[in-house]
Design a protein with these regions (language model features):
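A short, Lys/Arg-rich alpha-helix, primarily the initiator
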Residues: 1-35, 42
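Conserved hydrophobic/aromatic packing and binding residues within compact polymer-binding modules
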Residues: 25, 39-40, 50-53
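Helix-turn-helix DNA-binding elements, focusing on the entry/boundary residues of the two helices
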Residues: 36, 47, 62-65
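A short, basic/aromatic helix-end/turn motif that makes direct DNA contacts
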Residues: 42-45, 72-73
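Recognition helix of helix-turn-helix/homeodomain-like DNA-binding domains
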Residues: 44-60
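Short amphipathic recognition helices of helix-turn-helix/homeodomain-type DNA-binding modules
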Residues: 79-89
Length: 89
């Protein structure tokens, strides 16, 4: 996982492997004390998908990475999720 700062000062993350992404996400879940249900509710995804991410069986998309970054405080405005996804695509 690599956190990158854009020219406007906002932060987002890139990832190299599914395992590293799962490790990073698991650490953040542990740090925040949130449950899978709470995270799923915030991101509007299923708990099964999150479990697959954590176990490295689900290949995260750029949208997933940005959404998790916003959830865990790396991005200030949720609208940046969509801006970053557009920039990447």
């Amino acid at each position: 996982m690599k956190i990158i700062q854009r020219s406007d000062g906002k932060f987002f993350a890139t990832y190299t492997t599914r395992t590293k992404f799962g490790d990073w996400m698991a650490q953040n879940l542990f740090r925040t004390g949130m449950t899978l249900r709470e995270v799923a509710g915030k991101l509007h995804v299923s708990r099964v998908t999150i479990s697959e991410h954590l176990n490295g069986r689900h290949n995260p998309t750029f949208r997933d990475v940005v959404a998790y970054c916003w959830l865990f405080g790396n991005i200030d405005d949720p609208n940046d999720i969509y801006k970053l996804v557009k920039e990447e695509s």
